[in-house]
Amino acid sequence: MGSRSENVGTVTREGSRVEQDDVLMDDDSDSSEYVDMWIDLFLGRKGHEYFCDVDPEYITDRFNLMNLQKTVSKFSYVVQYIVDDLDDSILENMTHARLEQLESDSRKLYGLIHARYIITIKGLQKMYAKYKEADFGRCPRVYCNLQQLLPVGLHDIPGIDCVKLYCPSCEDLYIPKSSRHSSIDGAYFGTSFPGMFLQAFPDMVPKHPTKRYVPKIFGFELHKQAQLTRWQELQRLKLVEKLESKDVDLTKSGGFKT
């Protein structure tokens, strides 16, 4: 829309106005105005590399938006704003605070729609392309041999936890290295994405590594009894903490505090 457009029809140089005709351009160009789509601007932000572009047709299909109406205020405005279909006159009459709220709601709604879109056939294909390029990073575990990671949320409800990265090799979760990525809401990727992805692309399921690191001292493995003793001590400490949290006094007969 006009609020996100940038006029490139004229160029100002040393106080003089140079018309578009003086600038070498493609003869096929029939417009002097370039419009940045909201989705393009969103995806272009630093830290948004994990997201793929959701088709506008998917966003405007009411069936795909079921149960999302109450997640933001002025739902219809937000949907129109995301797909650049909101009338300029409405935007011009909004206060600065309302525009900021609209932008915030748009990012939230796009994220929640994104979580649904990436488990569709089209969405999985787009995320597959990003996975092949390791856009989500690689597993830091040495024996996983730079296995590509997949984004996942621990909750489907926004505002609970940030996105995590799942390794299909060691099947463990990791926190993104960049603070820009680690602050993204996990609900924008959902809890089902890795499972759906690996089911859709079974060839991407790696062989689980059998090699594990074994601690050694001067080349010798730790004695099994020493390992068992440490494990037993750890379990004892956990039990003590659990009992104390339930007001059990371990120094008295019967245990319970009076």
UniProtKB/Swiss-Prot annotation:
Chain positions covered by the region annotation Disordered: 1-29
Gene3D superfamilies, alphabetized: 2.20.25.20, protein kinase ck2 holoenzyme, chain C, domain 1
Native source organism of the sequence: Saccharomyces cerevisiae (strain ATCC 204508 / S288c)
Alphabetical UniProt keywords: Phosphoprotein
The keyword Aminoacyl-tRNA synthetase belongs to this UniProt entry's keyword annotation: no
Compositionally biased residues, Polar residues: 1-10
Cellular component per GO, a single term: small-subunit processome
PANTHER family found in the cross-reference section: CASEIN KINASE II SUBUNIT BETA
Family: Belongs to the casein kinase 2 subunit beta family.
Record's comment on post-translational modification: Phosphorylated by alpha subunit. The N-terminus is blocked.
PROSITE patterns, alphabetized: CK2_BETA
Function of the protein: Regulatory subunit of casein kinase II/CK2. As part of the kinase complex regulates the basal catalytic activity of the alpha subunit a constitutively active serine/threonine-protein kinase that phosphorylates a large number of substrates containing acidic residues C-terminal to the phosphorylated serine or threonine.
GO molecular function: protein kinase regulator activity; protein serine/threonine kinase inhibitor activity
Keyword Phosphoprotein annotated: yes
Pfam families registered for this protein in UniProt: CK_II_beta
Record's protein name: Casein kinase II subunit beta'
